[in-house]
A protein has these predicted regions:
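Class I S-adenosyl-L-methionine-dependent methyltransferase catalytic core
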Residues: 1-145
Length: 145
């Protein structure tokens, strides 16, 4: 799967892309050499994904819905593990594997990060085109982190 993450990050860094559709399970696999994880995990079992990501002891950024902030788990993670949050002024658009985008996103999402951002909460402007999040917006973000 050639995600927007992979496209943008691989412009300046080596990327090891994995996906469950490739038969690679996040809970069973860890690349031999890697520095940072950026992922869009399923929106179910959020706490399990965070526990697994934290177990590596390496920086990460996971996309999660902002409604998760209402749960007790992220509050505890912000307190105990210094979880970080990259929020946007607009809703992210998600593009399906077949290239279709969804203009009717009913929820907002953020990157929930650990040991990744220069401060605990960052608010960024998200440049959105009619089709998808602008390439420049993602490129700019990944150049600054």
């Amino acid at each position: 799967i050639d995600s927007e993450f992979t496209k943008q990050i691989s412009k300046q860094n080596k990327v090891i892309a994995t996906h469950i559709s490739m038969g690679i399970d996040f809970f069973d696999f860890e690349p031999e050499y890697w520095d940072v994880m950026v992922s869009n995990p399923p929106f179910t079992n959020k706490r399990k994904y965070f526990e697994r990501a934290l177990s590596f002891g390496k920086p990460f950024a996971l996309i999660m819905t902002n409604t998760w902030l209402n749960d007790s788990a992220p509050k505890q993670l912000f307190k105990d593990k210094d979880l970080q949050l990259l929020m946007f002024d607009k809703r992210m658009k998600f593009i399906s594997p077949d290239g279709r985008d969804n203009d009717k996103i009913t929820f907002s999402s953020s990157y929930y990060c650990w040991n990744f951002l220069p401060k605990q909460i960052i608010m960024e402007e998200l440049q959105v085109t009619k089709k998808k999040v602008s390439q420049a917006s993602l490129e700019s973000f990944f150049e600054t982190v």
